[in-house]
Design a protein with these regions (language model features):
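N-terminal organellar transit peptides
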Residues: 1-88, 95-234
Length: 234
């Protein structure tokens, strides 16, 4: 099963790079590998490149907490959005003390969602759990972005898409960088991105193949005998 991240260790003092470029899920098979990747970093710097539409909230929250724990040991994390950081991926992006966003990238914040099956009591308990997770994520937005609870509640009330400039203004990003050409490893169709966001991932139309020049077909050669026959038929 392919993990939702790739890890590249760098020699010497160069930052290690962790690329999160898939939907976040199947956490039970990846938690140990993610932790092992962090524990194996010899550099004091880590760059986390993010291009994800989100996924399982507890998986992403686990990633965020591991990254913050790693940074709290006196190390430096830079998060860099390379396309989109949506849903729980937006929380992971906030794990960096330096948070870079190219000018044509986006973040999306919204409320926690989940499903449940069972009795009415089971459904009420599930709703209570969702509410508690919602508060936990709201507190992260408040703490890392420097906004108040009312603003965090407002942007989480619906799918709130933020441009890189808006992210800088609101404290989600700390630095804007030059625009990039983004590619998506996740399923763009299933992600249901707004058109202005999906355009980031659309490559320019490839130039059309040059029209091959065709030589005119040669005139049919009429043999004298054929010409005589034609005259007889007229």
């Amino acid at each position: 099963m392919r993990p939702c991240f790739t890890f590249t260790a760098k020699a010497g003092d160069k930052p290690a790079v962790l690329a999160l470029d898939e939907e976040i899920g199947f956490w039970g098979t990846q938690a140990k590998d993610f932790r092992a990747s962090l524990d194996g970093i010899t550099s004091n710097e880590l760059v986390v490149e993010i291009n994800s539409v989100g996924g399982e909230v507890m998986a992403g929250l686990g990633m965020y907490n591991m990254l913050r724990q790693w940074a709290n040991d006196g190390k430096t994390i830079t998060t860099r959005v390379t396309g989109v950081a949506a849903s729980i991926a937006s929380v992971i992006a906030l794990a960096g003390d330096k948070r870079q966003m190219p000018k044509n990238t986006f973040a999306m914040v919204h409320a926690v969602s989940g499903g449940a099956w069972g009795t009415a009591e089971d459904l009420r308990e599930a709703a209570d759990v969702v509410d508690k997770i919602q508060v936990s994520l709201r507190n992260i937005y408040v703490d890392r972005m420097g906004i108040d609870e009312a603003k965090a509640t407002e942007i989480m009330a619906k799918d709130t898409w933020l441009t890189a400039e808006e992210c800088l203004t609101m404290g989600f990003a700390t630095e804007l960088t030059d625009a990039v050409t983004a590619t998506a490893k996740f399923d763009l169709a299933r992600a249901e991105l707004p058109e202005h966001v999906a355009r980031v991932f659309k490559a320019e139309d490839a130039p059309a193949d040059p029209v091959a020049e065709t030589e005119p077909e040669p005139e049919p050669v009429v043999k004298p005998s054929d010409q005589a026959n034609e005259e007889e038929q007229v």
